[in-house]
């Protein structure tokens, strides 16, 4: 990051830069004094996060009268979500990543079950975090081929390449002294989204912010899209269409 240190440092304070990280006090929206208890009334399970030094844990328990009839503690390894709206929580066992049944809504300072866990659908600690989810909420990870939710390495936060494309060629050319006056010319060793045609600019954002059902093209994966491509080269995104409804959903 030596070439663009100020830009990088500024970017890391944005929602995308804070999108995914270890669940430590530095990166979590949960504080020592703000750890809301939640209750799944259908399955009669309570969830209470707590800190132990700089590690975050989630306690699941069930009560019958004054007796505790069930108790399970799991360490939270990652927080997902910048904290602008939410922090959700993940744990990892031997590279396999699952979501935990606890989401903190930062603006209202309340906690609840994550979306999809409500109304009796609380899968507790078994929801797998697949590559479609991980590849939008984080930089592209090293995903184990053939696995749903096993990762050989997991980055921390959406990186520069998500909007600017692979940077290896760009770095090599700059280190070799090939400097372009970008006030006059386009530097084709890296993608500047501002210089893309409008439809390709939208495709960079719509890769993750268009809320629909993504269907991959044959032979493609969720990590194949690169800025400057047409999104349709990698996937088609289908949106629900309602009668007399002209709007579509974009994720914030």
Give the positions of each predicted feature.
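Primarily the internal scaffold of c-type cytochrome electron-transfer domains
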Residues: 5-82, 88-93, 101, 112-118, ...
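Well-ordered mid-protein domain cores that form the structural environment of catalytic cofactors
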Residues: 109-140
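Residue-level signal for beta-strand positions within conserved beta-sheet cores that form or flank
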Residues: 98
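Domain-scale recognition of modular recruitment/scaffold domains used in eukaryotic signaling
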Residues: 95, 106-110
């Amino acid at each position: 990051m030596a070439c663009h240190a100020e830009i990088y440092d500024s970017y890391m304070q944005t929602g995308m830069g804070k999108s995914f990280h270890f669940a430590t006090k530095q990166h979590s929206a949960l504080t020592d004094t703000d750890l809301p208890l939640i209750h799944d009334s259908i399955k009669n399970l309570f969830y209470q996060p707590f800190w132990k030094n700089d590690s975050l844990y989630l306690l699941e328990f069930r009560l019958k009268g004054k007796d505790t009839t069930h108790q399970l503690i799991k360490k939270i390894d990652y927080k997902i979500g910048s904290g602008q709206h939410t922090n959700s929580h993940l744990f990892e066992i031997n590279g396999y990543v699952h979501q935990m049944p606890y989401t903190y809504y930062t603006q209202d300072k309340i906690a609840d079950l994550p979306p999809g866990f409500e109304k009796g659908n609380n899968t507790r600690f078994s929801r797998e975090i697949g590559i479609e989810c991980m590849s939008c909420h984080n930089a592209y990870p090293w995903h184990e081929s053939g696995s749903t939710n096993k990762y050989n390495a997991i980055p921390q936060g959406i990186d520069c390449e998500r909007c600017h494309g692979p940077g290896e060629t760009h770095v090599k050319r700059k280190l070799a002294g090939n400097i372009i006056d970008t006030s006059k010319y386009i530097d084709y060793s890296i993608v500047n989204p501002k210089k893309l045609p409008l439809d390709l600019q939208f495709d960079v954002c719509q890769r993750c912010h268009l809320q629909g059902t993504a269907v991959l093209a044959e032979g493609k994966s969720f990590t194949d899209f690169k800025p400057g491509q047409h999104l349709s080269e990698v996937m088609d995104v289908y949106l629900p269409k309602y009668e007399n409804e002209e709007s579509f959903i974009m994720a914030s």
